[in-house]
Amino acid sequence: AITAGALQPGRLSVHREPWGFSREQAV
């Protein structure tokens, strides 16, 4: 699921999974 967040923009990621959004911001 984290991979999906990375593929999608942070804004969309935060909607699906907050941790994925945070991870992309850190990276």
UniProtKB/Swiss-Prot annotation:
InterPro entries: SMIM43
Keywords noted in UniProt: Cell membrane, Membrane
GO CC list: plasma membrane
Compartment annotation: Cell membrane
Any single biological process term in GO: mesendoderm development
Pfam families in the cross-refs: SMIM43
Membrane topology (UniProt): Single-pass membrane protein
Main location: membrane
Region (Important for interaction with SLC2A1 and SLC2A3): 15-21
Subunit composition and interactions: Interacts with glucose transporters SLC2A1/GLUT1 and SLC2A3/GLUT3; the interactions may promote SLC2A1- and SLC2A3-mediated glucose transport to meet the energy needs of mesendoderm differentiation.
Function: Required for mesendoderm differentiation. Interacts with glucose transporters and promotes glucose uptake. Probably augments the glucose uptake capacity of glucose transporter proteins to meet the energy needs of mesendoderm differentiation.
Name of the featured protein: Small integral membrane protein 43
